[in-house]
């Protein structure tokens, strides 16, 4: 965000803030599980105004919703409404301020706020009498959430969910916060009502000022007139410097510079691992570039090693929790999000390719990727082919028990001893299991994990093998078998709540990540016993990624088939954002961009031109719906009269920026569909330039965009392979092209038995080569590399292909 514009909002907010209370006092220490919003949570003086108890004019309508998050609130005494033109018109007719609560189904603190306040009859009476109350699923309506979250972040310096916004009936916000603990929320309602009744004009004035400031803030302008000027500002070096400052050299991962605490820690692949992989392959000679490459690789790998060994990883069932509340990656916030699983697999395999074959870090990356794939394919894949969104942070230890955070995942020592018998001592030693539990009380403010254990690597395989008189491979086998026994026993517990809506954007991320292990590992041989011995020294488990990769391509194809059948309307050429018992709201930019990215990967994995042609159709529709004709780049959503600020999605978060992904897609299209090279290249450049202020001033906020600039600086290349998919040499050519980490390349496979005639109409090089195949000039298996509009001579032997791929 641009600081000057943020301060505009901040000053307006402070005026409003002072009008709410002259005697604000901070509340008790905020729970360590989430980051507080400094100015959003206060101990407010109780108003003398009391709520009356008339029959509410509105009733709770969420039972009609299809959103799992909204359905969680269908039995609240609060008269919740869905975000809609009808609801907004009703608020204006009733002339009441609006209370907007935005969250998502897997959010622990959303559940806490609901239990403490929204399920409370007295609080609900106040809310129903004084406000029109609207619930928003941020995953279905990110456009609504994004606008008000920008306000919250600008005035408080932070944000999070649940997001709580008070606004005028005209949708102009005048007060914001996140989670308000009991009784503060009750008191806040009194105070907001008092101020609205006594000084409504000031609230409305502040709200109008906020909207104008948000409009200014969303208009970032340009700092560079050309891509060369933007590259000359050295964004990659600046990004590396920022990441180096925030890097935790002891435990891995990244923290906020100057923070007094080292947690929480998020995977945040688009901000950390994705750009680090690019930096680790940055071009150029000299000591400085060599240092950046080595340090970036180690920063990313240190983070992956820590996540592999930490409690953030579900050792029993696979998959990764959303974040760790502590610096050591031991105590997770237990919700599991599909977007994290998807991005982590991609990042693991990016880093794997930065190391030689059979290097211990390469194998560790394979192992972690397999662990995540195992979980997503087993527990998040719907029978129809799409992937569900998330599993909840809260769960019950047994059916009928009160839900608490992480109950499904944590263990008493007595439980482990009973299940594992004679193997329990070795298992307990490896995972640091204690009779009284191993969770520090400072990370368990509500005492929900008292006496329980979070599994995390406490000792190495070598250490426990020595301790119990075993060989390392024996110790490893015991632990693998023990984890499976615990998983089967754990299935008797009540599983965490499942958010079973299917989101286009997140499924697009899944298509991308499913293609990568298929391309890298499909039909690779199992590791040999000597390699397993080397692996033991690296303290990793058996990389089952070699076996699980065969499931990846069918799963990716299943997603695309589901989207085409349920979420794509060919008559209007539009996507929907979500699907659950029917279509959800209209799709947004990230839905198009992430799905396009996945389809381009799917084309490279299969050689089936239908995927790139569908991607092209989606790209044209994305341009029609979201392109900014004035300043370039993409708006995050389509025009909507009730979303007062049409914003651009420039900054990365838990997911990459849709704008940055779009720029990368456009660069790939410029090669694949070279007949429109100038159009795609111009749009890619304009998209990067639209993010220019952030790229030059705050590169870490746009790490994915900087990654794309690194690719552009290296120069994109097109690897063209000609020959039958069943030809052994072709398989080796494709394997060689995929194994080396080149994020700036596209692979085109021309198969004589299935010539890509549709692609040939849009790519002159492919068209010419198809003519050569049909005329008999191209008979043998070959590989060539094209760069800058020029193709090199073909090579027809594997060694020559490897050298060519290495040298380019």
Can you say where each PLM-predicted feature lies in the sequence?
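N-terminal chloroplast transit peptides
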Residues: 1-29
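Replace the tail clause
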Residues: 3, 17, 32, 39-509, ...
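Intrinsically disordered, low-complexity cationic segments
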Residues: 7-10, 32, 42, 610
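The core hydrophobic/aromatic register in alpha-helical repeat solenoids, strongest
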Residues: 276, 348-351, 514-517, 599-602, ...
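Alpha-helical positions within canonical tetratricopeptide repeat
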Residues: 295, 299, 361-364, 368, ...
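Long, polar/charge-rich, low-hydrophobicity segments
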Residues: 378-385, 565-593, 598-761
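Long, K/E/R/D-enriched contiguous segments that form extended
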Residues: 489, 501-611
């Amino acid at each position: 965000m641009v600081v000057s514009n943020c301060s505009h909002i901040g000053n307006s907010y402070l005026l409003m803030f002072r009008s709410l209370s002259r005697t604000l006092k901070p509340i008790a220490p905020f729970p360590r599980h989430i980051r507080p919003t400094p100015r959003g949570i206060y101990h407010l003086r109780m108003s003398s105004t009391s709520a009356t108890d008339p029959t509410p004019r509105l009733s709770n309508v969420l039972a009609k919703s299809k959103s799992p998050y909204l359905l969680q609130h269908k039995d609240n005494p609060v008269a919740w409404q869905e975000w809609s033109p009808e609801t907004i018109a009703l608020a204006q007719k009733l002339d009441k301020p609006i209370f907007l609560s935005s969250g998502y189904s897997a959010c622990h603190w959303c559940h806490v706020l609901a239990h403490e306040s929204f399920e409370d009859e007295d609080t609900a009476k106040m809310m129903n009498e004084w406000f029109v109350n609207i619930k928003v699923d941020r995953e279905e309506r990110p456009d609504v959430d994004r606008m008000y979250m920008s306000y919250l972040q600008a005035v408080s310096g932070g944000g999070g969910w649940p997001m709580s916004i008070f606004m005028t009936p005209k949708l102009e916000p005048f007060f914001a916060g996140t989670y308000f603990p009991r009784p503060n929320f009750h008191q806040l309602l009194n105070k907001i009502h008092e101020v609205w009744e006594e000084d409504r004009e000031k609230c409305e004035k502040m709200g109008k000022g906020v909207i104008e400031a948000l409009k200014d803030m969303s208009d970032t302008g340009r700092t560079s007139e050309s891509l060369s000027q933007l590259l000359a500002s050295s964004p990659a070096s600046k990004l590396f410097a920022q990441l180096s400052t925030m890097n935790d050299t002891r435990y891995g991962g990244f923290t906020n510079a100057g923070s007094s605490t080292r947690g929480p820690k998020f995977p945040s692949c688009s901000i950390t691992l994705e750009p680090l992989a690019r930096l680790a392959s940055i071009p150029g000679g000299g000591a400085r570039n060599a240092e950046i490459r080595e340090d970036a690789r180690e920063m990313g790998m240190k983070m992956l090693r820590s996540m592999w060994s930490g409690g953030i990883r579900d050792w029993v069932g696979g998959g990764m929790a959303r974040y760790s509340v502590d610096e050591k990656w031991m105590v997770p916030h237990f919700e599991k999000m599909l977007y994290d699983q998807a991005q982590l697999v991609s990042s693991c395999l990016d880093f794997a390719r930065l190391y030689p074959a059979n290097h211990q870090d390469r194998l560790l990356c394979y192992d972690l990727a397999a662990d995540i794939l195992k979980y997503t394919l087993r527990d998040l894949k719907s029978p129809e082919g799409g992937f569900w969104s998330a599993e909840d942070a809260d769960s019950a230890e047994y059916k009928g028990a009160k839900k608490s955070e992480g109950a499904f995942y944590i263990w008493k020592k007595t439980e482990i001893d009973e299940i594992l018998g004679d193997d329990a001592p070795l298992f307990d030693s490896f995972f640091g299991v204690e009779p009284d539990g191993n969770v520090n009380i400072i990370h368990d403010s509500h005492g929900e994990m008292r006496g329980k254990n979070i599994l995390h690597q406490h000792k190495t395989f070598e250490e426990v093998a020595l301790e119990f008189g075993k060989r390392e491979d024996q110790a490893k086998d015991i632990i693998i078998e023990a984890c499976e026994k615990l998983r089967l026993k754990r299935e008797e517990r009540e599983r965490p709540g499942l958010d079973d809506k299917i989101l286009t954007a997140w499924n697009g991320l899944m298509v991308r990540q499913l293609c990568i292990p298929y391309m890298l590992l499909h039909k690779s041989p199992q590791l040999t016993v000597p390699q397993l011995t080397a692996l033991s020294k690296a303290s990793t488990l058996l990389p089952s990624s070699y076996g699980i990769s065969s499931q990846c391509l069918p799963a990716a194809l299943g997603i695309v088939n589901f989207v085409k059948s349920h979420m794509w309307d060919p008559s209007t050429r539009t996507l929907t954002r979500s699907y659950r018992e029917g279509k959800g709201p209209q799709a947004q930019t990230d839905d198009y961009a992430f799905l396009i990215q996945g389809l381009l990967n799917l084309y490279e994995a299969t050689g089936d031109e239908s995927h790139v042609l569908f991607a092209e159709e989606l790209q044209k529709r994305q341009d029609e719906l979201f392109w900014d004709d004035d300043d370039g780049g993409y708006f995050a959503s389509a025009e909507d009269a009730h979303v007062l600020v049409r914003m651009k999605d420039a900054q990365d978060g838990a997911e990459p920026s849709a704008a940055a992904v779009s720029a990368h897609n456009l660069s790939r299209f410029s090669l694949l569909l070279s007949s429109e090279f100038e159009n795609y290249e111009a749009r890619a450049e304009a998209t990067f330039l639209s993010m220019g202020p952030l790229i030059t001033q705050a590169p870490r906020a746009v790490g994915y965009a900087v990654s794309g600039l690194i690719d552009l600086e290296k120069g994109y290349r097109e690897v063209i392979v000609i020959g039958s998919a069943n030809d052994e040499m072709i398989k080796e050519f494709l394997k060689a092209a995929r194994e080396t980490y080149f994020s700036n390349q596209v692979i085109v496979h021309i198969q004589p038995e299935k010539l890509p005639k549709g692609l040939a109409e849009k790519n002159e090089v492919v068209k010419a080569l198809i003519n050569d195949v049909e005329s008999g000039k191209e008979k043998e298996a070959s590989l060539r590399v094209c760069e800058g509009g020029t193709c090199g001579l073909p090579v027809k032997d594997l060694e020559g292909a490897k050298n060519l791929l290495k040298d380019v």
